Amino acid sequence: SNQLGMQNKHWTRKEAINHWVFWAVIAPFLIPPIFSTAFFFNMVHLTEIKDWSLISFTALFPFYTSMSIFTTLCSGWILDKFGVEKILPFYLLPMSLGLLIISFGNTYLHAMIGLAFLGMTQGLAMTIGGTFWPNYYGTKNLGSVRSLSTSTMVFGTSLGPAIVGMLLDFGHNYNSILLGMCILAMIASIS
């Protein structure tokens, strides 16, 4: 297709990088890969402080996966109906809620509900990313614009576990770290 982006033009990668919208949305797009990777990378520590069995906790992963798949399928219709610009400010809220529930909760039910909310944001993220870039930057140079955002997200996945690991090494409480991640996701939502 030959869809135009903002200002009725096809944006180059250089033009996209120099435009404020690119930098305004990169934080909300980075949050799910950074936080999800950090969360799952540190699940042994989480299960230890919550006094959960690692096997029982991982048995709850289908709730994450199922919600992610369900939300991915539904988000296409939602984005078509309301538009990416209306959904983007809200798509990190389920992740925030999931992190909040897991931070304060101590039961497997809390873990199950929290994982479902994390999966909801993951499902939304998969569809929102594919919709946002062509809508805002056009399709002619979509590969080069998306490759920049994707490589930034891949880099972000390496930062999450490293930052959380350092915070834990410095003696910070993991529940407080999860709460901080919740707050950062909410801030990124409204940015």
Model-derived segments and spans:
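Helix-to-loop junctions at the C-terminal end of transmembrane segments
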Residues: T71-G83, L168-D169
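A late C-terminal transmembrane helix in Major Facilitator Superfamily
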Residues: T139-G171
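Intracellular juxtamembrane helix-capping segments at the cytosolic ends
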Residues: L124-Y137
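Structural signature of the two symmetry-related core transmembrane helices
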Residues: K86-L100
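MFS transmembrane alpha-helix packing/gate-lining sites
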Residues: M67-T71, T121, T152-G156
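Paired small-residue
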Residues: L109-F117
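Extracytoplasmic gate region of multi-pass secondary transporters
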Residues: K14-S75
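A membrane-interface helix-boundary motif in multi-pass transporters
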Residues: M166-L184
